């Protein structure tokens, strides 16, 4: 799994801090994963 990036950028694979394989967006503070209506936020 890809790690959350240090700079804002979309993740091509799920972040290792997220349980879902949904779309993941990396932010400096962590990452946000979405799968349908489910959303999970997580920090590095």
Swiss-Prot record:
Transmembrane segments: none annotated. Disulfide bonds join 4-18, 11-24, 15-42, 17-33, 26-31. The keyword Disulfide bond applies. Keywords: Disulfide bond, Knottin, Neurotoxin, Secreted, Toxin. It is found in: Secreted. Expressed by the venom gland. Its main location: secreted. GO terms for cellular component: extracellular region. The keyword Secreted applies. Belongs to the neurotoxin 03 (Tx2) family. 06 subfamily. The presence of a 'disulfide through disulfide knot' structurally defines this protein as a knottin. This is U4-ctenitoxin-Pk1a.
């Amino acid at each position: 799994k890809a790690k959350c990036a240090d700079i804002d950028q979309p993740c091509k694979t799920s972040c290792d801090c997220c349980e879902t394989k949904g779309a993941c967006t990396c932010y400096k503070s962590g990452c946000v994963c979405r799968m349908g209506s489910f959303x999970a936020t997580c920090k590095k």
